[in-house]
């Protein structure tokens, strides 16, 4: 499977047993569709035939500018993690 695309690399906390998947909790806004698209992209990226990985995800408030910026950064981090897992890093 080809790696997902991302524009930056960031360090991530290690897997935690408390979370089962990375999700974007956005609903009922124009940004909700963006959140859904991000979730679908990550789900597609993570469907490679490898064991499931437990990841911690941030709590995000998409109704603020800072929250939207954090959501985009978290999405890039998740893509980086997905790429690393697909490459076996």
Swiss-Prot record:
It is a lipid-anchor. Residues 1-10 have a biased composition (Polar residues). It comes from the Viruses. Residues 1-47 form the signal peptide. Component of the spanin complex that disrupts the host outer membrane and participates in cell lysis during virus exit. The spanin complex conducts the final step in host lysis by disrupting the outer membrane after holin and endolysin action have permeabilized the inner membrane and degraded the host peptidoglycans. Host outer membrane disruption is possibly due to local fusion between the inner and outer membrane performed by the spanin complex. Interacts (via C-terminus) with the spanin inner membrane subunit (via C-terminus). Part of the spanin complex which spans the entire periplasmic space. The spanin complex is composed of spanin inner membrane subunit and spanin outer membrane subunit. This is Probable spanin, outer lipoprotein subunit. It comes from Pseudomonas phage phiKMV.
